[in-house]
Every structure is written in structure tokens, then in C-alpha cells.
From Swiss-Prot:
Allosterically activated by ATP. ATP binding is a prerequisite to magnesium and substrate binding. ATP binds to 2 of the subunits in the homotetramer inducing a closure of these 2 subunits and the release of the C-terminal loop, thereby activating the enzyme. One of its GO terms (molecular function) is magnesium ion binding. Mg(2+) binds at residues 151, 153, 403. InterPro entries: HAD-like_sf, ISN1. This is IMP-specific 5'-nucleotidase 1. It comes from Gibberella zeae (strain ATCC MYA-4620 / CBS 123657 / FGSC 9075 / NRRL 31084 / PH-1). Its EC number is 3.1.3.99. Its cofactor is Mg(2+). The gene is ISN1. Homotetramer. It catalyses: IMP + H2O = inosine + phosphate. Keywords: ATP-binding, Hydrolase, Magnesium, Metal-binding, Nucleotide metabolism, Nucleotide-binding.
Length: 446
């Protein structure tokens, strides 16, 4: 029984998104009932009828899920002591900051992906993920999108590469700035100097500096949050690197300021020992790298690849050890949350005295950072909100775009607790998402 538990939970559940898997399971029923794998493509009327019926049933299911989310949101807003039906079906369901027009989003994606016309391949994880992205895009454009935050690697540029001047994502980001939407790049890269971030983002920063249709205020509407939530840089046209560091005293939230340096050091010491044990026990070709606000393992020699399973094992081991210690907190969301109120990072609600951390798989390394992206996005919300109206940009007015949303070893996951999110799988998908947003904004204006 113990072995089965470990296999089913420790090695599988952390690689799934329970909400997406649940929706995918709902859509599997009409696929089985209405698909015609025994037909032939020459049988036009039969295939057309099948697609129409499957489309109708898929749309009905998405509408039913949409209504369940509405009920979940109403109970969030009322702080109801009784769980919603959605929460009973999916205990991990987090806060929703906006309605999700899933029926409309499905119809939109069905026109692009022809989900209803497929006879051999059921609606997939990626189909549902794209439907949710479209629904969230529709929701934030129906409201007022004020802040868009982005991960770096795999979101804005390929893993290990830089944001070059030829990148198609750059004109889309400039378009957001023209629309007076603030941009925060919230990356795990923990550089302490501006020149390293300029090296990674020079294509975008140079494009902003050279732009003739962005006013000075719009050019200042971008910040870089490095090391998850540890280093803030603002745009500076007079700097050779186009960035200037912002002292922590100017942007730390009161909760973040309460984390003592001694506790941070002790947490990183425990994490370093756990990482060292993993390197020895798994015989990893890796070495320890210690920074002032992070510790991790990287390959001993460039070009060496570490097995994905070994990286995941390391993340789960280190995370568990830190959670069991008296120092670290990796809570995923607050126990109470009103989506209409300023977002509260997850560890505040229950363990404000413990230091939040994020253990994540970087693709070929593992790092433990102080804080996580919920705090990084929160800093962006407060930084821009305080300049506009003295408050914080709300979760329903924030969209975080990233590629790592699985529940363990993924550092975008925590951002779900402080704003709306879009889950992409490549820079090309980011471009597609931004085009989708721009199109929806244009339709709203017209």
C-alpha cells in the first residue's frame, strides 16, 4: 500500500493539473459517444453530423463548468463556510479572480483546432489548457487589464537563450505599453547586477529606448523582478544597461520585510544540505551553487544533462525537508481570499513568521529561492499601483503568463493565488496569446 501511494502520488499527481484533468475527463464522454472512428473521410454527411453533435455536447459541458465556477466565485466573495460543488469535486481548486466564459472560449478554440471534428484523438490536456487561456483572455479584456507579468525562459524566449531584437514577442509587448498596460518580467534568474538582465532582455529594452511612439511614462511602465521576488530593476534610459536597481527598502512589502536575514540564512543552509544529500544519493553530475537569496545545483560541466526524474526527485525531497523544518513555508494559497480585494500572498494567511520559499526544476538544474512568484507578482502590483492610485493593482486586473504551472517543481504555479494566469508552452504560444488579447481588446473598442 505504501509503495502504491508513493507511485500514484509522489511520482504522478505532481505532474498533473487536477482541474484540467477533470475537464478533460468530462469531455471524454461525448467523444466516446459521438466519434465515428469506423467511418471514412469520404462519408461527408456522417462526419459533419458527428462534428456538429460533438460540438454541441462539448459546448454544453463547458457551459456547465462555467456555471460551477460562477457558484465557486460567489462563495469566495461571501466567505461561505460551505464549500462549493467545484471545491468538493476538486479540493485543490484555487481562487478565481474573474468569471471564465468557457463556452465562448471553447467555440473560439474549436474554430482554430477543430476539436469536434476529430474521430481518433479525444480532447486533450493541451486543448483544455488553450480553452482556459482563451477564456481568461476574454475575461481580462472584458474587465480592465492593467498589469501583464511574464516568466522569462520558455515564455518570452527559448530556454537558455536571450530576447533578441528579431523576436516576434517584442512588438506585442510594445503594443501593451502603448495601451498603458504595465509589464513586469518576473523571472527565476537571480542576477544582482543590471548588466546580466540587459544581456537576457536587450532586444526588448533597446526597442523601448528607440521607440518614438511611447511616451516617457509608458517607457517607465516596465520592471524586472529577478530571483522570483528578490531583485527589482526599473527602466532607466540614462543607464548603459537601460536598467537601474531599486533598493529593497523601496519595494519590500511589510510581510517580506519581516523575514529576518538570520532565518533566511538558516533556511538556505537546510536547503543546501538537502541538495548535497540528493547529489550524493542520486550520484548527480552536479555541484552546489549558493547565492545570497538562493541555493541550487547546476551541472558540473557545460553540456551535461541531468535526468528529468532526478531533478524532480531532488525538488520533492528538498521541498519536503524544508516544509518539515521550522523555517520554511510553501503554502500554495491563503486560507481566506476575496478576489475583489488586494491580493495576499499565500504564506501570509497561516505562517507569516515562516520564510516562504520556492523549490523548482529549471530544466537542467534545481534551485531553492526565497519567496516565490506570488510575491514577485505582488511587488509588481504594489509598485505600479502605488504610483497610480496609492493602492495595489487587483488580481482581476493582472494577468501572469508562464510555462510552469504544475503543482511541484514549477515556479509559476504560486502566481495563481494573486492574479489571473495563462499557461503557455513556448514563446510562439506567448505570441499567439498576445495576438489574441490584442484582437479581443480591439473588438471591445469597436
Amino acid at each position: 500500500m505504501t509503495t502504491r501511494y508513493r507511485v500514484e502520488y509522489a511520482l504522478k499527481t505532481h505532474r498533473r493539473d487536477q482541474f484540467i484533468e477533470w475537464v478533460k475527463g468530462l469531455l471524454a464522454v461525448p467523444f466516446v459517444l459521438y466519434s465515428q472512428p469506423t467511418g471514412v473521410f469520404g462519408d461527408g454527411p456522417s462526419v459533419t453530423q458527428m462534428a456538429e453533435e460533438a460540438h454541441r455536447r462539448y459546448a454544453e459541458i463547458m457551459r456547465d463548468v462555467e456555471l460551477m465556477i460562477d457558484d465557486h466565485i460567489s462563495r469566495q466573495q461571501d466567505d461561505s463556510m460551505f464549500p462549493s460543488k467545484l471545491r468538493m469535486l476538486i479540493p485543490t481548486a484555487g481562487p478565481f479572480f474573474t468569471r471564465l466564459p468557457l463556452e465562448a472560449a471553447f467555440k473560439y478554440q474549436d474554430r482554430k483546432r477543430y476539436i469536434s471534428s476529430r474521430r481518433f484523438v479525444a480532447p486533450s490536456f493541451n486543448d483544455v489548457r488553450q480553452i482556459l487561456n482563451s477564456a481568461q483572455s476574454m475575461a481580462v479584456t472584458n474587465g480592465s487589464l492593467q498589469l501583464a507579468t511574464f516568466d522569462g525562459d520558455v515564455t518570452l524566449y527559448d530556454d537558455g537563450f536571450n530576447l533578441e531584437p528579431t523576436s516576434p514577442v517584442i512588438p506585442r509587448l510594445l503594443d501593451l505599453l502603448r495601451k498603458n498596460i504595465k509589464i513586469g518580467i518576473v523571472t527565476a534568474a537571480g542576477y544582482t547586477s543590471a548588466d546580466r538582465y540587459y544581456e537576457r532582455l536587450h532586444g526588448l529594452l533597446d526597442a523601448i529606448a528607440e521607440s518614438t511612439d511611447l511616451d516617457p511614462v509608458q517607457k517607465q511602465s516596465i520592471i524586472i523582478m529577478g530571483g522570483e521576488a528578490n531583485y527589482l530593476f526599473e527602466y532607466s534610459p540614462s543607464s548603459p544597461c537601460k536598467l537601474a536597481p531599486v533598493p529593497r527598502t523601496q519595494w519590500l512589502t511589510p510581510e517580506m520585510a519581516s523575514w529576518s536575514d538570520a532565518d533566511i540564512t538558516r533556511l538556505l543552509d537546510v536547503a543546501e544540505n538537502a541538495l548535497r544529500d540528493c547529489v550524493n544519493n542520486l550520484n548527480l553530475p552536479a555541484m552546489i551553487m549558493r547565492k545570497d537569496r538562493a541555493v541550487g545545483i547546476i551541472p558540473k560541466t557545460p553540456g551535461t544533462r541531468i535526468a528529468r526524474e532526478s531533478l524532480e526527485e531532488t525538488v520533492l525531497v528538498v521541498q519536503r525537508i524544508l516544509e518539515l523544518s521550522s523555517l520554511g513555508s510553501s503554502e500554495e494559497r491563503p486560507t481566506k481570499h476575496r478576489p475583489s480585494s488586494p491580493p495576499i500572498p499565500p504564506s501570509v494567511a497561516s505562517q507569516s513568521r515562516r520564510v516562504p520559499f520556492c523549490a523548482f526544476n529549471g530544466g537542467n538544474d534545481v534551485f531553492v529561492d526565497i519567496g516565490d512568484k506570488s510575491w514577485g507578482v505582488t511587488v509588481c502590483q504594489q509598485w505600479f499601483g502605488s504610483k497610480e492610485n496609492g493602492g495595489a493593482i487587483r488580481g482581476e486586473n493582472t494577468l501572469h503568463v508562464g510555462d510552469q504551472f504544475l503543482s511541484a517543481g514549477s515556479n509559476d504555479f504560486k502566481a495563481r493565488s494573486v492574479g489571473t494566469t495563462a499557461w503557455i508552452a513556448s514563446p510562439a504560444e506567448t505570441v499567439e496569446l498576445l495576438d489574441e488579447l490584442a484582437d479581443m481588446m480591439q473588438k471591445k473598442l469597436s
